[in-house]
Amino acid sequence: MDGYDVKGAPARIAKALRRAGAREPEDELYAFIDRAMAAHEDYMRAAGVLDESGAWLDADMYDEDDACEAVLAALEEGADEEAMPALLMKLDAFMECEVAYLEEIGLLAF
């Protein structure tokens, strides 16, 4: 994505998740982050926010609720009922962090 720090994103997101209360081991946390980032990017491509190469197309096509639902759908595959509260907490922190970052770098404006 234009201007998006792909290499720095996992560490930035991990800090947000830890502040929100995520306590799992680093490898599990980063696996969650990788899956969430991939699902978020998939949503943005499907919504017309990004093109296939990752270039930013149209920020007006971004819908935060739809993005959250798409990421949740990808993350909850295979998750058991007991894992859902922690998953939802991490999803909320992930989306807050991502949207704030996209606004900060000027890709989104609400």
Please provide the spans of the model-predicted regions:
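Conserved aromatic-histidine-acidic binding/catalytic patches
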Residues: 1, 25, 83
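Hydrophobic membrane-targeting and insertion signals
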Residues: 1-19, 109
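Alpha-helical polar/charged "hotspots" used for coordination or helix-helix interfaces
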Residues: 5, 19-20, 40, 98
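An amphipathic alpha-helix signature
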Residues: 6-14, 30, 34, 38, ...
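Amphipathic alpha-helical interaction modules
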Residues: 21-68
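Amphipathic alpha-helical binding modules
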Residues: 72-110
